[in-house]
Every structure is written in C-alpha cells, then in structure tokens.
C-alpha cells in the first residue's frame, strides 16, 4: 500500500483505475456508521475473468500491494483489502448471487462524490 493515502484517496485512485479498465456498475459505499471492518466498499462488475483480473491489477498498480487479495484464481469475485477500503471486483453472475448491495443497503452510496458523476441506481438483482 502506498504510504500517505487516506481512505478517500484510496477510493478515488482505485475507482479511477477500475473505470479505466471499463468496470461497470461501480458503487462506493461509506460504511463508517455501520461497521469497523472498513470505511468504504467499492463494488464493480467485469464482463469476464480476464477483465476482472485486469481491473484488480490496475487497482493494485495504483495503490500498491493490498493487505490481502482473494479470488484471483477463478476471478468470479476478487477482493482487494486495503484496510480501510475494500475493493470487490465481480463477474456479473457472482455479483447477482452475493448481492452485497442488499447486504449493505443501509450504507451511504457515495459513488457520485468520488467519481464526479451522479450515483448510479443500484440494479435490482
């Protein structure tokens, strides 16, 4: 992990990297009021294993090595844990199955704050 990055810096840089690799359905959830496990979850969707790995690699290239990485082998759901920020890169079927949007639905959606775009509606899965 690159030194001196705040949680917001990690979200911004990781989000930029994911979008540069054409990640879709990107959401940023602020979890600070709900849990101590992380301040932010960043969810994104890839259309293939190859794209999922490319997104995860781009995030790691921007932020440096994660504290923990899970799921690179099959790339259905790749998790990159940066302590206060956790990036989730899903293939579409895995995203539908695990439905983290529902699980963390009480969290503030801050996608627009970080991307400069209006928050995308969470698709009903």
PLM region descriptions:
Residues 1-33, 47-50, 54, 71-77, ...:
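Long, contiguous binding/interaction regions
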Residues 36:
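P-loop NTPase catalytic core of nucleic-acid-dependent motor ATPases
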Residues 55-61:
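Short amphipathic alpha-helices in soluble, non-transmembrane regions
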Residues 64-71:
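Active-site phosphate-binding and catalytic loops of NTP-dependent enzymes
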């Amino acid at each position: 992990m690159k030194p001196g990055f705040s949680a917001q810096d990690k979200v911004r840089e990781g989000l930029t990297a994911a979008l540069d690799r054409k990640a879709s359905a990107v959401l940023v959830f602020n979890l600070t009021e709900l849990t101590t496990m992380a301040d932010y979850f960043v969810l994104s969707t890839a259309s293939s294993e190859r794209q999922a790995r490319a997104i995860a690699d781009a995030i790691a290239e921007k932020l440096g090595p994660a504290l923990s990485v899970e799921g690179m082998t099959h790339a259905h759901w790749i998790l990159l844990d940066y302590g206060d920020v956790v990036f989730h890169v899903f293939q579409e079927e895995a995203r539908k199955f695990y439905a983290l949007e529902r699980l963390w639905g009480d969290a503030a959606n801050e996608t627009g704050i970080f991307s400069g775009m209006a928050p995308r509606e969470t698709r009903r899965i």
